[in-house]
Curated annotation (Swiss-Prot):
MF GO annotations: peptidyl-prolyl cis-trans isomerase activity; protein folding chaperone; ribosome binding
Gene: tig
Functional summary from the UniProt entry: Involved in protein export. Acts as a chaperone by maintaining the newly synthesized protein in an open conformation. Functions as a peptidyl-prolyl cis-trans isomerase.
Organism of origin: Pseudomonas fluorescens (strain ATCC BAA-477 / NRRL B-23932 / Pf-5)
NCBIfam families registered for this protein in UniProt: tig (TIGR00115)
Cited InterPro entries: PPIase_dom_sf, PPIase_FKBP_dom, Trig_fac, Trigger_fac_C, Trigger_fac_C_sf, Trigger_fac_ribosome-bd_bac, Trigger_fac_ribosome-bd_sf, Trigger_fact/SurA_dom_sf
Protein's recorded name: Trigger factor
């Protein structure tokens, strides 16, 4: 077999391959012999059909199959011989397919970029530390109470945080617009559910009152047909209900699966959950900084095949998340290209760090992570057992741990500054990073 390789770009390779005709004919004859053993042709006993008849009937199909198999096998033999690492399936262009002649074809494909991860010392990381103070715990208890608020009808004017039951009709240019009217809608004043001015315009209203609100849709309103348009809303208030926060009782604690523990037991459980959330938030922020630093220090070209695969995967995820009748390939690729590129580049960089430093998942850390995740459930032992009985789930945890070990490896070489902050600042969500 003869092989020659041309570098047509940084990552694209054009490989010309010539396979001896004898190899093709050997595969064709093998298939014809197999066919002869089972072919049923009128006038002949099974297995006794002359090869000339078999060739006449089946050689074309046998040759097509043989050529396909030989191309596939010879391609992978060639990339191994040339020490190439394809990043996707090749595009194959046959050149010579004539019977009795050597098979010649050209395979065009991309390879994975070859690089060494560098620039660790240029990565700056701010590592936060924080504690769950009693005031943080008190705030969380108040949040939990508000999340379980009940509303009772009140015979008074509406205030912020009250829940109103309303009917409304919205018009633009004197015409009711699609989605602009509803009956029996529950609206909490101050929730920000409606456009600016709507909820504010109902403060002070009483049950049975009708108000007309003249408002303007925001410029960035999701419905572009309504963006920046003046609108008139006629609103009828059916009822006004005031919020009633639940007391910190055993009944309230039971809603969170905590029974017969009392207030102190409930506080201890909430604190434990907050501390777990705090650890995860700090770890996530450190990881994001490390990944951003690796990206900035290691610009690499991305194989288009990998980028396309990741875009398609994100399309499928989006359809699964948001539903609807849309098909994944109907979503514009441009929506996902930045995120896809970031993921692909980071995947390549992380894999190279693992290779450079010969990292393997630390099984002790794997068990610790599983136990920490399991602690959020009522039967943690069962959760731990479930992970160790499911190899796929266990391998996913191993991948997470291996990525954590990559972060630790980078931190040993990066410029790290420790900073003490409040619990609130430490758990504040990080803005989604943008691809470079």
């Amino acid at each position: 077999m003869q092989v020659s390789v041309e570098n047509t770009s940084a990552l694209e390779r054009r490989m010309s391959i010539t396979v001896p005709a004898e190899r093709i004919e050997s595969q064709v004859n093998k298939r014809l012999q197999q066919t002869a053993q089972k072919a049923k042709i009128p006038g002949f006993r099974p297995g006794k059909v002359p090869m000339s008849v078999i060739r006449q009937r089946y050689e074309a199909d046998a040759r097509q199959e043989a050529v396909g198999d030989v191309i596939q096998a010879s391609f992978y033999e060639a990339v191994v011989e040339q020490k190439l690492n394809p990043a996707g399936a090749p595009s194959v262009e046959p050149k010579v397919l004539e019977k009795g002649k050597d098979l010649e074809y050209v395979a065009t494909f991309e390879v994975f970029p070859e690089f060494t991860v560098a620039g660790f010392e240029n990565i700056a990381v701010e590592r936060l530390s924080a504690d769950v103070a009693d005031a943080d715990l008190d705030n969380m208890l108040e949040i939990l109470r508000k999340q379980n608020v009940r509303f009772e009808v009140a015979d008074r004017a509406a205030q912020n945080d009250d829940q109103l039951n309303i009917d409304f009709v919205g018009k633009v240019d004197g015409e009711v617009f699609a989605g602009g009217s509803a009956k029996g809608t529950q609206l909490v004043l101050g929730s920000g559910r409606m456009i600016p001015g709507f909820e504010e315009g109902l403060v002070g209203a009483k049950a049975g009152e009708e108000r007309v609100l003249n408002l303007t849709f925001p410029e960035n309103y999701q419905n572009l047909d309504l963006a920046n348009k003046a609108a008139e809303f006629t609103v009828t208030v059916n009822s006004v209900s005031e919020p009633k926060l639940p007391e910190l009782t055993e009944e309230f604690f039971a809603q969170f699966g905590i029974k017969e523990a009392g207030l102190e037991g409930f506080r201890a459980e909430v604190r434990k959950n907050m501390e777990r959330e705090l650890r995860q938030a700090i770890k996530s922020k450190v990881k994001n900084q490390v990944m951003d630093g690796l990206l900035a220090s290691n610009p690499i070209e991305v194989p288009k095949a990998l980028l396309d695969n990741e875009v398609n995967r994100l399309r499928v995820q989006a359809v699964q998340q948001f539903g609807g009748n849309i098909k994944p390939d109907q979503l514009p690729a441009e929506l996902f290209e930045e995120q896809a590129k970031r993921r692909v580049v980071l995947g390549l960089i992380v894999a190279e760090v693992v290779k450079q430093f010969d990292l393997k998942p630390d099984e002790d850390r794997v068990r610790e992570l599983i136990q920490e995740m399991a602690s959020a459930y009522q039967e943690p032992e069962q959760v731990v057992s479930w992970y160790y009985k499911n190899e796929q789930q266990l391998n996913e945890v191993r991948s997470v741990v291996l990525e954590e070990q990559v972060v630790d490896t980078v931190l040993q070489k990066a410029s790290v500054t420790d900073k003490s902050v409040s619990y609130e600042e430490a758990v504040k969500p990080v803005e989604a990073p943008q691809a470079d």
